[in-house]
Amino acid sequence: FLSFLSVIILTALGRGIQLRYFPGLTEGLKGVFLALPQFCVLVGCAAAAVLLGLYDDKHSMKAWKKLIGQILIAAVTATWGGVSITLFIGIPLVSWCITVFWFVFIFNAVNFFDNMDGLAVGTATIAFIFFACAAAVNGQYFVASLAALSAGSAAGFWLYNRAPASIFMGDSGSHFLGYLLAVVS
């Protein structure tokens, strides 16, 4: 949280003050400044996924309405979030469609797995650990950090979600977990 806050403060201070008083910090934050709009899109879409799940938990949405919400969240992420599956495909529209399909697939896969105590969270924890290792080996440290933090959070939740469960994720939790898995993968 403090690092995110420092980025906001340094952005507000302006480039001249940054270069004069924080030259090393400013050089290290160049990538953060460039990725901040995409990061905000990812955070906003994650919040939208949680809200979609909360609404479904409270009002039992029809499947097609939930699917439309999932497609919209995935489309915004694929368009402005900087997340895309290329698979060596040179056609951006095909890559975009595959990315949207992947997000919707992962949303629903995690939601489907959430029918037994600890299954969805345990599976997600293991997946996050592997994604963190793969990203770290490939030098993608932001993705590795996000996956490692998600693995730790999911493992902590799993302790209370395993049989006999004392807390449950619901659709809001499974949508958030599915969104994180789709982003990290």
Stretches found by the model and what they are:
Residues 1-185:
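"…together with the soluble PPM/PP2C metallo-phosphatase catalytic core" -> "…together
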